[in-house]
Amino acid sequence: MKSILKKAKHFFHTNETVNGENGGEKTAKESESQQHHQQQQQHDENGANPPDQGVDEASNVSQSQPTTSALQTSTSLQPSSSLHQIPQSQSSLELTTNPTQQLPTTPTKQLPTPPPPQQPHSQQQQQQQQQSQSQLNNNDISISTNTNNTTNNTNNNNNIDSTLTTPVPSSENLATLSTSTTSEQQPNSQPTPNNTNTTTSPPPSSASTSNLSTSTTTTTTTTTTTTAAANENTNTTQEQTVSPNKPPQPPNALSQSTTSSSTSSTSLLSSTFSKFKIKLGSGSTKNKDSSSAPGTPHINNNNNTVSSSNKNRSTLVITPGSVNNNNNNQNNHKNNNTTPDHPPEEQKPVEKEVITIATLADFPEDCQKLIRISGIPEEKLIKNIQILAYVLHFRTGRFFKLVDEPPREPRKKFVSERFNDGEKLLEPVEPALLKKMYKDSDQVGKGGFGTVYFAKSTKEKRLVAIKKMPHVTKRQQQQNFREAAILAKCDHPNIVKLHTCHIDKDSNLWIVMEFMEGGTFEEAAKAWKFNENNLAYVAKELLKGLQYLHENHMVHRDLKSANIMMSVEGKVKLIDFGLCEDVATSTPMHMVGSPFWMAPEMIQQKYHSTPVDIWSFAISLLEMANQRPPMMESAVKAMFTVATDGATGFDDPALWSDCFKDFLSLCLKQDPAERATAEELLKHPFIKKADSRDNMENILKKIFLTNSLMNSGF
């Protein structure tokens, strides 16, 4: 009898646990319980095993023996029934969801339930939830988004990259969750969120905390984060990359627990921004499903400057001043490497610095040094300070203006229409084939406008001279084509002949000209002491070439010994027409050329024309007679003296005849209008003293063959 009463007592205790508050059905259940006790008593008397199942028709609940460690309950309740959470010592009622699926944003309607028993850590969990909610409400949210500013874009799919960054609480076990989202936006419509491959849960509430809990594990034990981890994550932003096939890993402070209580802050953030696709990682990490539209503006939170990008991803960063994200922003800026999607505005030309001069002491120190080296008397410099300013401008590139200088009329830019077709001279040849067309190239000279080589043309089976010049900028192209066009129009035995033009792979223009075996007038003057007959021969050849140029309204403007070629055959020709000017429709004024051969009117920055070539021609003859240019010790002194006093003359006048002196005096008149022309000089008696060509061939062969042997090491 005692055993029967003990079992009955246990039965009533179990029935109360299952049915809870259904007290209205107690009477019917007691009658059924008596019948059940009788069956068990009969079973005990017979010594058989207890039945497998006891069916409670009122509750329809399956039960097992009381000694079972876990009570697994499968319920099919009436609308008035409710579930009671079983104490933790017995079992756990778990709702396991696939972490790759998204929970519905609207929770299902739950049946009324009594408050569940408190878990050991429930009070701590509620405190964490309240603190996290207050932190999220009080702290600003830094939103970093990639968007296309063009609202009238005709594309139907415009990708928007967004980065959602929550500020890090300074005293809680929270970590910054950096979220990058991608959504498709239709024109003039709201963005449609993409599928989310993350486990999210709506914000917990007092009525449905236990029913809406989701977990990726099989236990409900809550793990607590350490204070050290929270402190470490306070000043840093941790970012993780989410694989399309794997659920995202939470930050360090949240990675130890994925239950509802430990992920309360994550659930709040996920539910608030559930319409975004979460992609944890740096701003520079690319995703197949997300791409920023070209030309996306970039605002740096440090200085709020705006830029845009065509190639790289850019982000729109709006950071409140209360959150310190300088390090993260700097890293994002480095990763983005944004470049403008439109060419930068052309830089305005830098205004030239003009130095006002009243006395010699007003010149800068570098100019003062050049003045001291020249050795020009101070009284002469003060008297001609304007000329000194012109000379120093040519030598240093600085601009000077006298205090009492009268205003000058602006310079006119003249563009000749006769020599603007040099591009037509280009021969259509692949740049890679140029080395095959011209073999055995060897450098023979180098100047300010390019480098000269001689080579063998495989096509023409002859030696040629090739002048290579940089051909990149617009100004270089204009000057190079201009020189080629002038040479193409010149057809004279005393002017070097043009063959063709090419452009190589390094953007250099090749001007292919006739090859002259020999050297320059400068080299010959240093190697040989010429007499008047030799000089008369050279003067006659040069004057014929100058006469041809001047009659065709062209001025060389850079005539000097280095631009005069002499061959072993006795030929004398003008080369290097890079500064040649068309004076048929213009009168140039600016200062160009070489300082020792420059005419006075050019140094004085006056309008000049063909007489400047006559002056330079005479200085070249003086160089040949003296075996050096006049006043070689100082370019400033040479230019200043020429502009004020004129040329100096012979080093040893006694060695030269009056005929030669008279010839040079006609060429070196200070006033260009009084200077003799090339046609007049060809009629001068000095020209009649010219040596024969055969004799000049022998002299030039001795000069240049000796130089060749010396250069070859023999």
Swiss-Prot record:
It holds the Pfam family Pkinase. Residues 62-83, 95-111, 120-166, 178-241, 254-267, 300-314, 324-337 have a biased composition (Low complexity). Residues 84-94, 167-177, 282-294 have a biased composition (Polar residues). Keywords: ATP-binding, Kinase, Magnesium, Metal-binding, Nucleotide-binding, Serine/threonine-protein kinase, Transferase. Its cofactor is Mg(2+). CDD domains: PKc_STE. Residues 438-687 form the Protein kinase domain. ATP binds at residues 444-452, 467. Residues 1-12 have a biased composition (Basic residues). The keyword RNA-binding does not apply. It catalyses: L-seryl-[protein] + ATP = O-phospho-L-seryl-[protein] + ADP + H(+); L-threonyl-[protein] + ATP = O-phospho-L-threonyl-[protein] + ADP + H(+). One of its GO terms (molecular function) is metal ion binding. Its EC number is 2.7.11.1. The active site is at 558 (proton acceptor). The keyword Transferase applies. It is an enzyme of class 2 (transferase). GO terms for cellular component: cytoplasm. Expressed at equal levels in prestalk and prespore cells. Residues 23-35 have a biased composition (Basic and acidic residues). Residues 1-267, 281-349 are annotated as: Disordered. PANTHER family: FI20177P1 (PTHR48012:SF10), STERILE20-LIKE KINASE, ISOFORM B-RELATED (PTHR48012). Belongs to the protein kinase superfamily. STE Ser/Thr protein kinase family. STE20 subfamily. This is Probable serine/threonine-protein kinase mkcB. The lineage of its organism: Eukaryota, Amoebozoa, Evosea, Eumycetozoa, Dictyostelia. The gene is mkcB.
